[in-house]
């Protein structure tokens, strides 16, 4: 079994090393990922643009490749150029942050998996849900920093890929969106559906001194027109039972959502 691993946090992010470690005993693993953070870029691809491919090493010294492009670019380069044969499976992640609800269409993590599907390769997008109350620590200077615990995510990913290796990818499913909480009550993986939305999104005027002080975004002096910043807030909490959000926030267990790339709505008969 040959697996291509990519992400949207960048090739040096700790999550991609965790993903490799989770499955390296099950398959031949090739890591190809963006050379920098590409969160929330969706399925952007660099058509007719120069891309730079470099060899590099992960933190454990294992070989990898960096691409000067998007997560979708990295998947295409990995599957079509780096690997001698098309991979049997693409894993995107482990993302440093949750990817649930219909908001996943803006996720570089999920869209890297979608790009794999367009190439005829089944895929898994994997994300770590970090509880703001437990996943951030303060250093001696009082600065906050994220503390990533991929233990359960690695276990769930390993067991899931082992099942795929033994039984094959299920028919009627193009990709899976797997989200694993770092602070959990149960290790049981629940099959879920997408919630309608995850976050509230707002636009602020970056020239507003009070707001710009709160969010600490430097002014873009070279920009013409209004200097705006888009932010998100208020993680939605009224998830319905059976949804990905309910599994993560209420049941506090891993959520596995089967997805199809074909987004056709078949309910409309006439209009």
Give the ranges of each region predicted by the language model.
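A cross-family phosphate/adenosyl-ligand binding-site feature
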Residues: 3, 14-81, 85-86
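Short, glycine-rich nucleotide/cofactor-binding loops
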Residues: 5-12, 103-104
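Short glycine-rich anion-binding loops that position phosphate/pyrophosphate groups of nucleotides
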Residues: 9, 37, 70-71, 95-98, ...
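Hydrophobic/aromatic beta-strand patches that form the interior of the parallel beta-sheet core
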Residues: 30-32, 65, 91, 122-126, ...
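Internal, conserved structured core segments that host functional sites
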Residues: 77, 85-139
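Phosphate/ribose-phosphate-bearing ligand recognition and processing surfaces
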Residues: 118-166
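C-terminal accessory domains and tails appended to enzymatic cores
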Residues: 146-148, 167-271
């Amino acid at each position: 079994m040959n697996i291509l691993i990519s992400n949207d946090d960048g090739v040096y992010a700790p999550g991609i090393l965790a993903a490799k470690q989770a499955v390296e005993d099950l398959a031949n693993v090739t890591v190809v990922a963006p050379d920098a953070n590409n969160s929330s870029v969706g399925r952007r691809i660099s058509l007719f643009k120069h891309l730079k491919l470099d060899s590099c090493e992960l933190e454990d010294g294992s070989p990898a490749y960096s691409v000067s492009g998007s997560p979708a670019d990295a998947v295409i380069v990995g599957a079509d150029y780096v690997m001698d044969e098309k991979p049997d499976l693409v894993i995107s992640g482990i993302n440093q942050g949750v990817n649930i609800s219909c908001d996943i269409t803006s996720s570089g993590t999920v869209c890297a998996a979608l790009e794999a599907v367009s190439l005829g390769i089944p895929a898994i997008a994997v994300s770590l849900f970090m509880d703001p109350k437990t996943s951030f620590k303060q250093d001696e200077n009082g600065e906050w920093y994220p503390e990533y615990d991929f233990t359960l995510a690695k276990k769930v990913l390993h067991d899931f890929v082992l099942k795929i290796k033994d039984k094959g990818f299920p028919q009627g499913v193009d990709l899976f969106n797997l989200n694993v909480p770092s602070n959990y009550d149960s290790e049981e993986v629940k099959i879920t559906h997408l919630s309608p939305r995850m976050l509230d999104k707002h636009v602020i005027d970056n020239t507003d001194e009070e707001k710009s002080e709160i969010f600490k975004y430097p002014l873009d002096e070279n920009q013409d027109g209004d200097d705006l910043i888009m932010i998100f807030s208020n993680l939605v909490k009224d998830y319905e039972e059976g949804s990905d959000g309910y599994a993560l926030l209420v049941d506090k267990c891993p959520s596995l959502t089967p997805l199809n790339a074909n987004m056709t709505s078949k309910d409309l008969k006439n209009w």
